[in-house]
Amino acid sequence: MEYEHLWLTAYGCLAVVGAVVVYCAIKQSLVTNWWFYGSIYPQVKLMADRTTFKPFEYPGCYDKWDTHEHAHWSFKELNMQDDVHDWHNRLSEAEKTFLVQILRFFTQGDVDVAVGYVQYLQLFQQPEVRMMLFSFGAREAMHIASYSHLISTLNLPDVTYQEFLKYKAMKDKHEFVFNSRFKSTTVGRFFNYLLFGYDTHLEEIAVKIALFSAFIEGVQLFSSFIMLLNFTRHGLMKKMGQIIQWSIADETHHTNSMMELFSTLVVENKSHIRLGVLEARVRDTARKIVQLEDGFIDLAFSMGEMRQLTADDVKSYIRYITNRRLQTMGYLPLYSVVENPLPWVEDLLNAPSHTNFFENKPTEYAKASLTGDWPW
């Protein structure tokens, strides 16, 4: 009798668990989702496959692709001989060390960014969204080749590309991008959705966009941009500065566009995303990115101040721009830096003069919506 009682108790518990599972499955529409979408999880419009090119679901993404395609450039437009002369004759040994420290991770930084676009393309399947992502990813290839061209122009050895792994500040930046904490498990995702109705996979995607696009493209790269542009500010390495200015125009467009995609993903799926948890994770990611960048800045400035630019100047700037990225995503700023601490950056970028690749004559880089005020 005692064993029968235990068996009945066990069967009763299983029946209760089964009833709860069935109830949750019905509540979360698991069967309906599977029947219509081939997945137990709710359909995400941004990730839905569409056979035909039109009508567009996201015409703004097509417009961003079109804008981007009106602003092509190539490092081959530039004759780098003046920069070679500056390197050999006008830069101090401390300045050369400073420049090399930045270049050690500069190309790798965009290699890491390109990985983000490869991952985005596997997720977002609407044709106009993919057009935007393809265009942005292709431009990252130009950035990588251009930054590599800077290294080759200065006749630095190929080992330069691996040297970042020897420096903790650089290696930590690289490894953080691919940290496992940005991945959700299949089992965890299933039970969280079954019991509570939120999809951790969507949260991970949103955090990943914030990581790659808002904080790596939009903060970390800008730290290096500013340190390199300080040479151009003083009439040095001007062709390098030209490449940086072109890259800034691109990265600004990429960052703003991807933060808009972030907002679209969250708004369209807010019933399946823990908004408070997402905000906390995005803010935590921003803090970590700034912390890692502080270490990199200290390493770069290990030889001291560089022509009216200090490590504290750059640290203040990245906090300012981090606030701007957070505000664009709809979050409150993290840091007390309200005004741009480096106004010369804005002055330098608002009056660029470039070279037309086909005509080889000066022209303003003022195409489509890349014109106008810079967003910082």
UniProtKB/Swiss-Prot annotation:
Its EC number is 1.17.4.1. One of its GO terms (molecular function) is metal ion binding. It catalyses: a 2'-deoxyribonucleoside 5'-diphosphate + [thioredoxin]-disulfide + H2O = a ribonucleoside 5'-diphosphate + [thioredoxin]-dithiol. Keywords: Deoxyribonucleotide synthesis, Iron, Metal-binding, Oxidoreductase. Transmembrane segments: none annotated. It comes from the Viruses. Binds 2 iron ions per subunit. Its cofactor is Fe cation. It holds the Pfam family Ribonuc_red_sm. GO terms for biological process: deoxyribonucleotide biosynthetic process. InterPro entries: Ferritin-like_SF, RNR-like, RNR_small, RNR_small_fam. It is an enzyme of class 1 (oxidoreductase). Fe cation 1 binds at residues 110, 140, 143. The keyword rRNA-binding does not apply. Fe cation 2 binds at residues 140, 217, 251, 254. The keyword Iron applies. The active site is at 147. Heterotetramer composed of a homodimer of the large subunit (R1) and a homodimer of the small subunit (R2). Larger multisubunit protein complex are also active, composed of (R1)n(R2)n. Ribonucleoside-diphosphate reductase holoenzyme provides the precursors necessary for viral DNA synthesis. Allows virus growth in non-dividing cells. Catalyzes the biosynthesis of deoxyribonucleotides from the corresponding ribonucleotides. Belongs to the ribonucleoside diphosphate reductase small chain family. This is Probable ribonucleoside-diphosphate reductase small subunit 048L.
